[in-house]
Amino acid sequence: MAADGERSPLLSEAGDGGAGGNGLAGPGGSATGPGGGLTPSAPPYGAGKHAPPQAFPPFPEGHPAVLPGEDPPPYSPLTSPDSGSAPMITCRVCQSPINVEGKMHQHVVKCGVCNEATPIKNAPPGKKYVRCPCNCLLICKVTSQRIACPRPYCKRIINLGPVHPGPLSPEPQPMGVRVICGHCKNTFLWTEFTDRTLARCPHCRKVSSIGRRYPRKRCICCFLLGLLLAVTATGLAFGTWKHAQQYGGIYAAWAFVILLAVLCLGRALYWACMKVSHPVQNFS
């Protein structure tokens, strides 16, 4: 039977000298004697240093990667090949370098010197970039013919249509001067070349004077006018002191003149404390 065939290698053969009559030979070479006890016939396998069975080749002995008493090698993190230098681009307005590390997912970056935008990627599908003469970067549709600058001090209309041959426009586009704000130290474009040199910064929305001449002139005028009104109020008070006791309207005249003097002196103080914005380049 199949079961007997599977156990047949374990049966002791008649010619085996190491086994008794009908005993079984165990794996260690011991056999069961007639009395049922185990009789050792050979030393157990593995005693001493014997070669492994012939069916398996011996494994080569080599040195381990880390000896039992040795520390592992130090950890050295892998570094990126381009980690030594940050990616930089040049500003399209002031030509200053701009660090774009960590901003590569954006389409535009802002310059830290002139606060203007510079594109680092192509415009989205169906869009295009347009640079206004005031250096404002605009994005519009590819099919747009005319766009308006959104900056409150510019509001320039830009024609993007095809250029038709013809005479030049008699009214050229006004140019301006880049000015450093006296409040927030940001740079903006000033286009109003008049005697009234007050400008509102588009970044902080505060008013400053372009140069010191205009606020100094207004301060002197207001101070002199306030001083004159103060002297007038003093003389009026001393000259009409007796009449004021009979006519109460004189007190109202005193109060009116004194109020005008205080307003003029306060305005002089306002012009004296006004911040001054300086142009980046000289007027030409």
Curated annotation (Swiss-Prot):
InterPro entries, alphabetized: PtdIns-P2-Ptase (IPR019178)
Domain of life: Eukaryota
Stretches with biased composition (Gly residues): 15-38
GO MF term (any one): phosphatidylinositol-4,5-bisphosphate 4-phosphatase activity
Native source organism of the sequence: Mus musculus (Mouse)
UniProt modified residues of type Phosphoserine: 169
Reactions accelerated catalytically: a 1,2-diacyl-sn-glycero-3-phospho-(1D-myo-inositol-4,5-bisphosphate) + H2O = a 1,2-diacyl-sn-glycero-3-phospho-(1D-myo-inositol-5-phosphate) + phosphate
Entry EC number(s): 3.1.3.78
Annotated motif CX5R motif, positions: 140-146
This protein's name: Type 1 phosphatidylinositol 4,5-bisphosphate 4-phosphatase
